[in-house]
Curated annotation (Swiss-Prot):
It comes from the Bacteria. 3'-to-5' exoribonuclease specific for small oligoribonucleotides. This is Oligoribonuclease. The active site is at Y129. Belongs to the oligoribonuclease family. It comes from Haemophilus influenzae (strain PittGG). Its EC number is 3.1.15.-. The lineage of its organism: Bacteria, Pseudomonadati, Pseudomonadota, Gammaproteobacteria, Pasteurellales. The gene is orn. Residues 8-171 form the Exonuclease domain.
Length: 182
């Protein structure tokens, strides 16, 4: 194990929709990497129980996607509350990264952060205030060097752990083909 303030916390949430005032978290996963994007540990992958009423109100895209990937069934079978999932995630992170050291890392991570602030505030407070958002590089590449976008394809399973792994690979791809640090 390598507890280090340079380690990066990667997180992804799946939600019932995009509005944190109306929607809720249904899955959370985390991965810790070192500063060079080498995976050190995968945290718990947790389906968060939500009511049938809330699940039935999801839009067509969410219904289709989360049915096809099995997430709705996992959510229905889960007994975990958002608070329990938050505490399990924090227990994992405390073994790898000190509080306030890592930016929140992922793709379109500001959206996840909005839900964390509302439903998992202790976890939201664990991160540094900065964001490491892979989608920023994708947007810049689309404008400045669009040809490199064709070299990275996502699976788009919309399962939290898969999405994090893809985000890490995507950042490594941009580091090699767009940023060229060598």
């Amino acid at each position: 194990m390598s507890f280090d303030k340079q380690n990066l916390i990667w997180i992804d949430l799946e939600m019932t929709g995009l509005d944190p005032e109306k929607e809720r978290i249904i899955e959370i996963a985390t991965i810790v990497t070192d500063k060079n994007l080498n995976i050190l540990a995968e945290g718990p992958v947790l389906a968060v129980h939500q009511s049938d009423e809330l699940l039935n109100k999801m839009n067509d895209w969410c219904q289709k996607t989360h049915s096809e990937n099995g997430l709705i069934e996992r959510v229905k079978a889960s007994k975990l509350t958002e608070r329990a999932a938050e505490l399990q995630t924090l227990d994992f992170l405390k073994k790898w990264v000190p509080k306030g050291a890592s930016p929140i890392c992922g793709n379109s991570i500001a959206q996840d952060k909005r839900f964390l602030v509302k439903y998992m505030p202790d976890l939201a407070d664990y991160f540094h205030y900065r964001h490491l958002d892979v989608s920023t590089l994708k947007e810049l590449a689309a404008r400045w060097k669009p040809e490199i976008l064709e070299g990275f394809k996502k699976e788009n399973t919309h399962l939290a752990l898969d999405d994090i792994r893809e985000s890490i690979k995507e950042l490594a791809y941009y580091r090699e083909h767009f940023m060229k640090l060598d």
